[in-house]
């Protein structure tokens, strides 16, 4: 009997392969980074072939660097950066353009036109989304309208669209399987989340031929098997590909948030707060998003979601652009050296603001800066006085991450009618104790960090394992979850409320900054 499940975790900056055992423990992992492409201001692209090859390299490395053998693998599960859009020629297998990444803002003007056409309510009702350049639909239209030959290929039924998991599955199966799962389809702005089908009106409105769209399947089932003849992956031939899910719902599943009202927050490049709402779709009145979290068998479960575009990326900005820190640990050390941010508020709206604001034209700003900073290379500095040092700025960055999540949590509580009693966390930045303590203080509830923080990959592994009987059911999976540390509120509520009020004022300063 196979011993393990292999998860492919294809992210924004790297591709990873992680092997899990029956207890959800990591047996082996490998990672391969790839290049980010910035053709113009606000544009972000990836090379689809580099995505593919980096993922294949991670897979070969996970076997070569460990004692795990391909015959030990029961199934493969895939999780991916959502919304990122790839289109390719079904005959040659070659992409017609670079992947347009979820962060890319090139379709902001098109989104304004869609709003002007009065489509907001229809899109919100049918797809559970707001109109934003974030989602795949406008990216597809951009490629069809701007890449020479793309629309002609579509009209000849020779063009295929997919988010990243679709691209990987198509290639792993030798071009035999063109599918997506409910969670990824829910992020295209083209999918009817109630009737679980592509929405004809949206496709017609955006002039997107439905023939290019993948078939939508549950998140846990055998889609196909790894084909023979894939260079470097020859020994994986015949292994079932049995799970596919977007990165954030994957983390929700990996955190064993199986009951309505259970929630997780992932601190990665951005921050993503999701709450399981069960088989009931919650329609948000606070600009949060509704989508299918996962489908298993003939049932789907929904999630309500809020996202902040910049979180861990801000710490990287401090390191790479301002040269204030050498690594993320140094940011924590600086932040811990001061009791507060000394009145500083940093709004990390580098690519606009996500929920609940959805302001494509917001830009990053720092307000309340005082004299004394040695690295004052900021886009917007307001209120210079004396007394601030870089420790205050480092702390303001961590506080900004926590403030953004507080915005989302309060909106989510209002929409769902549920008061949070616990927040489960994961992602790279969740290793920061000071960040999680600030978070607990701001949301006034328990924050718990599991022993396994690779919950995105774990969720994909669980779904694949369920499909092939490696795990019996969700009860068995839930027993695997172990808590590493719990954070409880330490700050007086009155002080917390005062700080949060200042954050709201700072956000208003950043809004509409890039609008003509």
Regions found by a protein language model. Name each.
Residues 210-211, 334:
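Auxiliary, metal-adjacent structural segments of Zn-dependent hydrolase domains
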Residues 64-101, 130-136, 169-192, 217-218, ...:
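Short beta-strand-loop/turn "lid" adjacent to the catalytic site in phosphate-handling enzymes
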Residues 6-8, 22, 108, 114-130, ...:
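Active-site core segments that coordinate phosphate-bearing ligands/cofactors
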Residues 104:
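Carbohydrate-associated surface elements
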Residues 68-71, 211, 418:
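Structured loop/turn residues at beta-strand edges in well-structured enzyme cores
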């Amino acid at each position: 009997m196979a011993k393990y499940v292999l998860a492919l975790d294809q992210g924004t900056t790297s591709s990873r392969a992680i092997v899990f055992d029956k207890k959800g423990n990591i047996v082996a992992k490998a990672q391969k980074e790839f290049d980010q492409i910035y053709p113009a201001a606000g544009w972000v692209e990836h090379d689809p072939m580099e995505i593919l090859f980096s993922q294949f390299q991670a897979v070969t490395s996970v076997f070569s660097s460990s004692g795990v053998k391909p015959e030990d693998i029961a199934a493969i599960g895939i999780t991916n950066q959502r919304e990122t859009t790839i289109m390719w020629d079904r005959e040659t297998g070659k992409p017609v353009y670079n992947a347009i990444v979820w962060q890319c803002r090139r379709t902001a003007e098109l989104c304004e036109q869609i709003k002007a056409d009065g489509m907001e309510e229809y899109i919100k009702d049918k797809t559970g989304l707001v109109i934003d350049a974030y989602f795949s639909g406008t990216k597809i239209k951009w490629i069809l309208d701007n890449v020479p030959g793309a629309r002609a290929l579509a009209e000849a039924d020779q063009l295929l669209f997919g988010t990243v998991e679709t691209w990987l599955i198509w290639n792993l199966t030798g071009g035999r399987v063109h599918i997506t799962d409910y969670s990824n389809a829910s992020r295209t702005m083209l999918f009817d989340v109630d009737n679980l089908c592509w929405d004809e009106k949206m496709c017609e409105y955006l002039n997107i031929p439905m023939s290019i769209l993948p078939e939508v399947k549950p998140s846990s089932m055998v889609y196909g098997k790894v084909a023979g003849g894939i260079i470097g992956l020859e020994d994986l031939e015949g292994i079932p590909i049995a799970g596919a899910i977007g990165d954030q719902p994957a983390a929700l599943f990996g955190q064993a948030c199986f009951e309505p009202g259970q929630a997780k927050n992932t601190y990665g490049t951005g921050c993503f707060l999701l709450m399981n709402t069960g088989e009931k779709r919650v329609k948000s009145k606070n600009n949060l998003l509704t989508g299918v979290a996962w489908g298993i068998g003939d049932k789907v479960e929904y999630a309500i979601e809020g996202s902040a575009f910049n979180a861990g990326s801000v710490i990287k900005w401090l390191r790479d652009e301002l040269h204030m820190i050498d690594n993320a640990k140094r940011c924590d050390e600086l932040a811990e050296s001061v009791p507060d941010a000394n009145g500083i508020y940093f709004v990390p709206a580098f690519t606009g603001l996500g929920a609940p604001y959805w302001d494509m034209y917001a830009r990053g700003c720092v307000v309340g800066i005082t004299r004394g900073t040695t690295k004052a290379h900021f886009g917007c500095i307001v209120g210079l006085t004396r007394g601030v040092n870089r420790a205050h700025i480092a702390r303001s960055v961590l506080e900004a991450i926590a403030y953004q999540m507080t915005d989302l949590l309060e909106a989510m509580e209002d929409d769902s009618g549920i008061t949070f009693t616990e927040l489960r966390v994961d992602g790279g930045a969740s290793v920061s104790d000071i960040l999680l303590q600030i978070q607990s203080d701001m949301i006034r509830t328990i924050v718990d960090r599991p022993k396994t923080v690779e919950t995105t990959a774990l969720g994909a592994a669980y779904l694949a394992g369920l499909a092939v009987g490696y795990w019996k059911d969700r009860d068995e999976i839930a027993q695997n979850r172990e808590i590493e540390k719990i954070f409880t509120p330490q700050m007086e509520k009155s002080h917390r409320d005062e700080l949060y009020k200042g954050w709201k004022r700072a956000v208003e300063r950043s809004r509409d900054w890039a609008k003509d």
